[in-house]
Amino acid sequence: MRGDNFLYQEKFYYEDAERTFQEHLAGTYKPKPTAVTETLSGVLPSNTLKQLESAVALSNKVEALSSENKELKKCIDGLQGLLLGLRQRIETLEGKTTGAKLAAPPQKEEEDDDVDLFGSDEESEEAEKVKAERIAAYQAKKSHKPTVIAKSSILLDIKPWDDETDMGAMEREVRSIAMDGLIWGASKLVPVAFGVKKLQISCVVEDDKVSVDELVEKIEAFEDYVQSVDIAAFNKI
C-alpha cells in the first residue's frame, strides 16, 4: 500500500519527463536546463538524464544552425540579385558599344564614296585655276591699298657769317632748293649774339625721296651767306 502511494505521488514526475522527451522528439521543446535538471535528477536514472541533456543541447544547436542557415540564404539571395543586375547592366553597355562599332563602317563607306581615286586631270587643273585666280585677286587688292608714306618734320638753324649778311637773300636762296618730296614751311629770324641773327626754317620731307644729308649740303653750298647748318629738331610724322 505504501508503494502504491509512492508511485501515485511521483507519477507527475514521470509524466513531465515523458512530455519533455516527446516534445524534444517532435522539435517543439523549449528547454529550461536548470528546471529540467532539478525536476528529473531525482526521478530518471543518470544515464537517461544525460541522454536527455545531450538531446536538448543538440536541439539547441540544430535550432541555432537553422537560424544561421536562414540568414545565410537571405545574404546569398541578395548577392544573386546584385550579380544579376550587374550582368544585365554589362550586357546593356556591351550591346550599345557593339551597336556603335557596327554603325561606324557605313559612315566610312559614305566617305569613301566621295573620294574619286581615279580623278581626272581636268579636276586638278580646275583647282589650280581657282587657286591662281584667288592669288591674283589678292595681289590686285593689295596693290590698290593706299601705301603709307613715311615723312619727317625738320627744323633747321642756318647761321650767317656776321651781322651784315643779307638774311632775306639767304632765305630766298634756301627756299630755291627744290627736291621731290621736299616742302618748305614757316621761317623766322632768331637772335644769336652781338646783333647776329640766324634763320630758323622748317620743312617736311618724304623719307624715301629726300636725304637729309644731301639737303644740308645743298644749303651749305651757298657759301656767301651760310656759315653752318644745324638740325634743331627732327620728328617722324
From Swiss-Prot:
Q: What Gene3D superfamilies does the record point to?
A: 3.30.70.60
Alphabetized, the UniProt keywords read: Elongation factor, Protein biosynthesis
Q: Name one Pfam family in it.
A: EF-1_beta_acid
CDD domains xref list: EF1B (cd00292)
Q: Which domain of life is it from?
A: Eukaryota
What GO CC annotations are associated with the protein?
cytosol; eukaryotic translation elongation factor 1 complex
Which SMART domains does the UniProt entry name for this protein?
EF-1_beta_acid (SM01182), EF1_GNE (SM00888)
Task: Offer an example of a GO molecular function term for this protein.
Answer: guanyl-nucleotide exchange factor activity
**Family, per entry:** Belongs to the EF-1-beta/EF-1-delta family.
- Write out the function statement from the record: EF-1-beta and EF-1-delta stimulate the exchange of GDP bound to EF-1-alpha to GTP.
Question: What name goes with this protein?
Answer: Elongation factor 1-delta
- Give the species: Artemia salina (Brine shrimp)
